[in-house]
Amino acid sequence: MTCKIHREAIGEGRVVLRVSGRLAGDNVDMLRTLLQQENNVLTLDLKDVRLVDGEAVKLLAIHESNGVRIDNCPLYIREWIRREREGM
């Protein structure tokens, strides 16, 4: 299963990155690069994410702490992010 990231501008200065598939390995680096390049207010939509690894969770936790909104996050990922943030 691959990872797909679709960028959608939803108004002036607001962008949603819709992530689907497997967010692990090289795909985490791809998402990291996209997040670093973005100058708009960001929302990550994780509705269609099926699998993440530890690096993905760390990335999500850091960016959520820095103001990126995470929508439609599967419960197991949400819990993992919460635990990661507690350890930061």
Role assignments for model-derived ranges:
Residues 19-88:
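Amphipathic alpha-helical interaction surfaces in cytosolic regulatory modules
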